[in-house]
């Protein structure tokens, strides 16, 4: 028979062990879950971004789960509808982010991040009578430029042009029309149009479409047909602009991201300098960006956003990629090596008088889809035999009706898209 004292000792030991087990379990639960990030980068770009995230994990002892996808809109929408959004999502569409903000899905940026979020990429939004900034550019790109190989003289009308881009086919054409409007009518008209205040049937908008039509068909109507058949990166994924001595088109209107396909031998000029029809002294450029927004608030997510917009992350990102893949930021990283294109893009970004976010990136998604469809229909007309009636009046009317539907439904527009460097 066990003594009462021994029973008490056994009971105390068991209680102590149970307490230690509970304490250990509680400590184990204190480890935060990984910060989930949904972004646009896959392949080599994903590997480069993962290196930046690895530095964050090492510095802060916080794990990050990154998911890269080219179907970012569909993936993010499905996750939000399933009530399981990522902690942070990175995407180029201000229009989509504005919708999420007005639906109450986004968390306002922390103060430290907001201070690093300049115009035109991060406008303030009024949501429920309170004004906040909801997204910040992680990296940016320059548009309003034309690329060429110096060894090959430009041939009139010989433009590299491809509309194919899966679910977003048509955007290279919308980029052209946006840039033409910016160069012809100036930042004020451009901003009114991009923010929903200017009719699609306005004379300046119509003129931009007609100018693009003349540019596309200057080398013959077959160029429009080829544009409909081509992917924007070409069938081989190496770009439409081929180096000498290969034959083919001689100029390409495209954003600075296209450097990754062409390397250091390709050169660019501002659209206003490269396209005689668009000559002006505005020094205004279209830009785009990959914006980070917080869908679920946590100290860890805030730390990651702060890190991604800071100098250490940007320096590591630049150092960890090939010259042709080097990213650009709202504030110059100052380390662009010897590549002519990298230094020149950075100088253009800092030397512009006005920078205006890609208009279709700022518009409501339904209107953007209609814009892309209209581009493809207009190209189909441009590539058809002469004698067919232009559909432009009808296309602009349809786009104006869609603008009206967006206003009637209360779809949010961003309040501004232009700013100074």
Q: Where are the regions that the model predicts?
A:
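Extracytoplasmic/periplasmic substrate-recognition and gating elements
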Residues: 263-327
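Extracytoplasmic/periplasmic solute-binding protein
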Residues: 136-138, 155-206
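Glycine-centered hinge/linker elements that transmit conformational signals in sensory
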Residues: 194-233
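Secretory targeting and sorting signals
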Residues: 2-29
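Short helix-initiation/N-cap motifs at beta->coil->alpha
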Residues: 68-76, 225-242
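Conserved C-terminal helix/tail region of periplasmic/extracytoplasmic solute-binding proteins
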Residues: 347-421
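Hinge/lid segment of periplasmic solute-binding proteins
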Residues: 94-144
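Early extracytoplasmic/lumenal segment of secretory-pathway proteins
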Residues: 32-103, 119-121, 385
